[in-house]
Amino acid sequence: MVDAGGVENITQLPQELPQMMAAAADGLGSIAIDTTQLNMSVTDPTAWATAMNNLGMVPVGLPGQQLVSDSICVPGFDPSLNMMTGITPINPMIPGLGLVPPPPPTEVAVVKEIIHCKSCTLFPQNPNLPPPSTRERPPGCKTVFVGGLPENATEEIIQEVFEQCGDITAIRKSKKNFCHIRFAEEFMVDKAIYLSGYRMRLGSSTDKKDSGRLHVDFAQARDDFYEWECKQRMRAREERHRRKLEEDRLRPPSPPAIMHYSEHEAALLAEKLKDDSKFSEAITVLLSWIERGEVNRRSANQFYSMVQSANSHVRRLMNEKATHEQEMEEAKENFKNALTGILTQFEQIVAVFNASTRQKAWDHFSKAQRKNIDIWRKHSEELRNAQSEQLMGIRREEEMEMSDDENCDSPTKKMRVDESALAAQAYALKEENDSLRWQLDAYRNEVELLKQEKEQLFRTEENLTKDQQLQFLQQTMQGMQQQLLTIQEELNNKKSELEQAKEEQSHTQALLKVLQEQLKGTKELVETNGHSHEDSNEINVLTVALVNQDRENNIEKRSQGLKSEKEALLIGIISTFLHVHPFGANIEYLWSYMQQLDSKISANEIEMLLMRLPRMFKQEFTGVGATLEKRWKLCAFEGIKTT
């Protein structure tokens, strides 16, 4: 029989749910619930399946009839396993496993099939339509809401359809074509949700009251939430118990119990106090007995003998301390000697680098090799200085220890000095040796400073020579650039002269053709008039005059006379300057002289002016290679003679 009143509190749950959640959060683990009242066990397979379903895990091996395939629905639990296959134990107290419900399962695209029952048939929805929506799953949900039922559907038909999903504990049907179904376990709800979207038809009837589209969704129920809270508390108790067992297992063992005082135990303890290997254990027992108040008149002599045995270990401990101090001093001395040897080798390496940077060897290295040597030298000097500072610090510490020993008035020191005079002499020699070492280090530092100053002076001289060479090379490059510019200008002038000569040639050829035609005409006239000889002479004279006139015009065009009175003044000054310098002067010399008279004039203007007057000034080149120099000379007197 199905209990129809098992889910009567479903609609009342939303009002009381916040109070229940707060009580569960505040009292989780502190509320003691008897497991007999819950009717569940740790080894119960259904309880384990429900717990794993709450955690979002998939149980395996559900026996009985299966509504859909295992890939779609959550499978059940195998009672013969008593544990979840392939799943390690999970801590339910970790974040996300408290009162927060697990995330909804991911949807899988599945082709649903027609389900045939005795009283009805379920037809799947169109696979192209989106899957039916569901609300957020409440924690510990075992109850589902089923809507869209046919009007003629009865509780027996509903039970026939949904009992394939699992054991049903209660069904509550409403008059408005919906009902609430409560299952025995939580994973059965997932199988019921699978039927959402199916169209239900009773028998073979086509009546509207005998068909309806099912909508299955999660429902909130007070009983489900209460059982879920109980399970959470049970898991919390199990986790606390497991954690306590783990802490007890990892806790360090307790110290061994100290036996009670007796004369026999006191005799054994006295023997242990005399043994060096068992002294630590025995002294602990002796301390405990004294603190307990075991000392009385009867046991005072025994305790005194044990305290005397403990005191006898003081001498042994002092001897061990002296041995360890001696070993430490030897280790310090070995370290200091090794550090001194390392510092000596550093000095030699730095000396090699300094010798390599001298002029005799330095000039033979390439630029990259010089750079590497300089880097290595700086690195070696830094390491050498660091090692030297470390050694000096060790010596300062030794001197401070010596001064402390001198100021100390310990009786052991006095006894040592009184016992042997040789120790005092050795101490004096050691002080003298240290002072000599200090002086030697000071001399070395002075030598290093002098070397560094010398290297700095040497580098400054090298830098000066390099700067001078660089300036000379820059001047040479500027001269070469200026020569290149002048050569380009001369080339342009030659090209213009060549074009002018071509124009003159074409012009003279045209004149010759005209004169030849005139000559032919005059010959015809001479034949008629008889004055051929005289007229031909006149024509030749006319031709020569025209050619000479054309040449003079071309020379005037080429020379391009002076444009202004300032240019004439400049030509006069330059002519006077070059007349005083018969071997010529370069353009820089001319420009420096002219700039004293006119600060606005440039060297390019002077050079262009000289190039425009080739009969007055000429250009000559002197020197070879880097010493090549261009000079201007005055040739006006020679030009007058040639004309």
From Swiss-Prot:
One of its GO terms (biological process) is ultradian rhythm. Residues 307-342, 425-570 form a coiled coil. The keyword Transit peptide does not apply. GO terms for cellular component: external side of plasma membrane; extracellular region; plasma membrane. It is found in: Cell membrane; Secreted, Extracellular space. Expressed in lymphocyte cells, breast and breast cancer (at protein level). Found in the sera of cancer patients with a wide variety of cancers including breast, prostate, lung and ovarian cancers, leukemias, and lymphomas. Found also in the serum of healthy volunteers or patients with disorders other than cancer. Probably shed into serum by cancer cells. Its cofactor is Cu cation. GO terms for molecular function: NADH dehydrogenase activity; protein disulfide isomerase activity; RNA binding. Residues 142-221 form the RRM domain. Pfam families: ENOX1, RRM_1. Its main location: membrane. Its EC number is 1.-.-.-. Not inhibited by the antitumor sulfonylurea LY181984, the vabilloid capsaicin, and retinoids. It comes from the Eukaryota. Keywords: Biological rhythms, Cell membrane, Coiled coil, Copper, Electron transport, Membrane, NAD, Oxidoreductase, Secreted, Transport. It is an enzyme of class 1 (oxidoreductase). PANTHER family: ECTO-NOX DISULFIDE-THIOL EXCHANGER, ECTO-NOX DISULFIDE-THIOL EXCHANGER 1. Belongs to the ENOX family. Probably acts as a terminal oxidase of plasma electron transport from cytosolic NAD(P)H via hydroquinones to acceptors at the cell surface. Hydroquinone oxidase activity alternates with a protein disulfide-thiol interchange/oxidoreductase activity which may control physical membrane displacements associated with vesicle budding or cell enlargement. The activities oscillate with a period length of 24 minutes and play a role in control of the ultradian cellular biological clock. This is Ecto-NOX disulfide-thiol exchanger 1. It comes from Homo sapiens (Human). The lineage of its organism: Eukaryota, Metazoa, Chordata, Craniata, Vertebrata. The gene is ENOX1.
